Amino acid sequence: MPIKILMPALSPTMREGNLARWLKKEGDKVNPGEVIAEIETDKATMEVESVDEGILAKIIIPQNSQNVPVNSLIAVLSEEGEDKADIDSFIAQNNSVSLSLKTDATLKKSNDSITNVEGIKHDSNKIFASPLAKRLAKIGDIRLENVQGSGPHGRIVKQDILSYDSSTSSNKIVYRDTEEYRSVPNNNIRKIIAKRLLESKQTVPHFYLSIECNVDKLLDVREDINKSFSEDKVTKISVNDFIILAVAKALQEVPNANASWSEDAIRYYNNVDISVAVAIENGIVTPIVKDANKKNIIELSREMKTLIKKAKDNKLTPIEFQGGGFTISNLGMYGIKNFNAIINTPQSCIMGVGASTKRAIVKNDQIIIATIMDVTLSADHRVIDGAVSAEFLASFKRFIENPVLMLI
């Protein structure tokens, strides 16, 4: 009897995903536990393993398909020598989702046709324009009915469009040929990022606090630790590792900053789980260092390296990037001095970390050169007030400027 292969739900909140690639083709033998496809979720590309043994009789949803609903039929397994008519009958009975999608597409096509007919009906006064004039008008977003034609019988020509463009400086348009850019379809990750960031800026009352941190002691301690592990290529502590640990220790001291908003109540988290923004090819992902306050700098560094590699390879599992109570975004390696990051909802805080640069400062009434790092906290004012945010930043500064406090 044929066996259904359904679109899996790779996380509790997943409703649809992209079927990125089939690793098996129709007619191939499939064994239990064998990877047969790759599914693209909102944060990573996940492998789909077969539960049963059989022949991949039919691929219903082709690769590179977007917005495939969870639990929809994507393929069918059959036993060796199973009758094709039985397989076709099985697909017809179980492929209601595909039929529904086709019906929706048909309705959309019909509606588009109706819209086009209505558009033609209202266009009672035909406008005469040369093909080049029409092309220039389209590129420059100029309505032809607003242009006075100078050609035979009022025909709009190239010069009319160019004259219209230069006649009013406030409406001056720079023409760009459509061949000067390339269009890249938005993948599922990009769409989710866009949706969440827009929602965050529109619904969360952001406010920002900045502070300068002297990281000279931290750089010295980091150098000493790395020298002691010079033979161990895996253990190489980064500045970002210290930043993660300092945030974790500060959240432990100021637990009111480790919170999120819900309509019924503010949730204060018992665990200190830190999300760290990692740039990947298709956007950004935030793997989580769980219980970061309970880890030493070596453990934290090794775990972070593993998470970054998995993120770059699109191999993160949902449990490794869903959740978290606080996010760190570090753009210092790009020379960015400071920036205001957008809160990663439903979290209430994100800290933007800038570059460490040599600056002149006053210490004991003397001007000295120090390595200064700017950090900016973006906070949700529904959850965290200014005093709590300031207390958190003061605690972070104390740990980052005195790294020994994090190591004891």
Curated annotation (Swiss-Prot):
Peripheral subunit-binding (PSBD) domain ranges (all copies): 128-165
GO BP term, pick one: pyruvate decarboxylation to acetyl-CoA
PROSITE patterns linked to this entry: BIOTINYL_LIPOYL, LIPOYL, PSBD
Enzyme Commission code: 2.3.1.12
Source organism superkingdom: Bacteria
Keywords: Acyltransferase, Lipoyl, Transferase
Cofactor: binding comment: Binds 1 lipoyl cofactor covalently.
CDD domains assigned: lipoyl_domain
Residues with the N6-lipoyllysine modification: 43
Catalytic activity line of the entry: N(6)-[(R)-dihydrolipoyl]-L-lysyl-[protein] + acetyl-CoA = N(6)-[(R)-S(8)-acetyldihydrolipoyl]-L-lysyl-[protein] + CoA
This protein's record includes keyword Phosphoprotein: no
GO terms, molecular function: dihydrolipoyllysine-residue acetyltransferase activity
Family annotation (InterPro entries): 2-oxoA_DH_lipoyl-BS, 2-oxoacid_DH_actylTfrase, Biotin_lipoyl, CAT-like_dom_sf, E2/Pdx1, E3-bd_dom_sf, LAT1, PSBD
Gene Ontology cellular-component terms listed: pyruvate dehydrogenase complex
Active site: 381
Cofactor: (R)-lipoate
PANTHER family linked to this entry: DIHYDROLIPOAMIDE ACETYL/SUCCINYL-TRANSFERASE-RELATED, DIHYDROLIPOYLLYSINE-RESIDUE ACETYLTRANSFERASE COMPONENT OF PYRUVATE DEHYDROGENASE COMPLEX, MITOCHONDRIAL-RELATED
Family, per entry: Belongs to the 2-oxoacid dehydrogenase family.
Binding partners and assembly: Forms a 24-polypeptide structural core with octahedral symmetry.
Job of this protein: The pyruvate dehydrogenase complex catalyzes the overall conversion of pyruvate to acetyl-CoA and CO(2). It contains multiple copies of three enzymatic components: pyruvate dehydrogenase (E1), dihydrolipoamide acetyltransferase (E2) and lipoamide dehydrogenase (E3).
Designated name of the protein: Dihydrolipoyllysine-residue acetyltransferase component of pyruvate dehydrogenase complex
Lineage: Bacteria, Pseudomonadati, Pseudomonadota, Alphaproteobacteria, Rickettsiales
